[in-house]
């Protein structure tokens, strides 16, 4: 799918007519509800030699030793059978993350609606922390809303509890008297 290889920012005319920004070229299909195991496999690969950021871990995290032990106690057989991805492919993805200056992980409603969604998102946070991919441009966490209109609403500042300033501006601009209680 084109969107998996290059991104064009729809509000930047130069990007829309240009080539876009290269984002990925490795597609790894995962078993249903196998995301947590895949991310645990990535953590295992990253910790065992594919590249952590020790300075970032030391300065911005806590509990690394306990996490490292939990990861090392998770066997490859359990990981690969649960996620349905070969160890080699997980390690290939871990190497790509190691070589990336900035990694961002996006997910949508499917991931958040699994029985183990919280643990899966925590594991995503952990692998980004391992490489220092939080708090810098082009890196971090990116939960994507389930419907385009929901995301678009948030992008333009619409939410279920609009600020007093927004409501005042709406009233002054349109003459509409919006409700102020929510």
Q: Which residues are covered by each model-predicted region?
A:
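Cofactor-pocket helix-loop regions in the catalytic cores of large enzyme subunits
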Residues: 1-148, 156, 170-182
């Amino acid at each position: 799918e084109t969107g998996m290889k290059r991104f064009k920012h729809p509000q930047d005319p130069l990007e829309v007519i240009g080539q876009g920004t290269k984002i990925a070229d490795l597609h790894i299909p995962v078993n249903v509800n196998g995301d947590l195991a895949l991310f645990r496999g990535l953590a295992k690969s990253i910790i065992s030699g594919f590249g952590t950021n020790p300075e970032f871990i030391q300065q911005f995290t806590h509990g690394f030793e306990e996490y490292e032990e939990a990861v090392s106690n998770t066997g490859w057989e359990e990981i690969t059978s649960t996620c349905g991805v070969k160890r080699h492919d997980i390690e290939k993805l871990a190497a790509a993350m190691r070589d990336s200056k900035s990694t961002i992980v996006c997910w949508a409603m499917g991931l958040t609606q699994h029985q183990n969604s919280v643990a899966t998102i925590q594991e995503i946070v952990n692998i980004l922390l391992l490489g220092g991919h939080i708090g810098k441009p082009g890196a971090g966490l990116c939960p994507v809303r389930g419907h385009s209109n929901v995301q678009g609403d948030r992008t333009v500042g619409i939410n279920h509890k609009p600020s007093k300033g927004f409501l005042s501006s709406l009233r002054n601009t349109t003459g509409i008297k919006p409700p102020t209680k929510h």
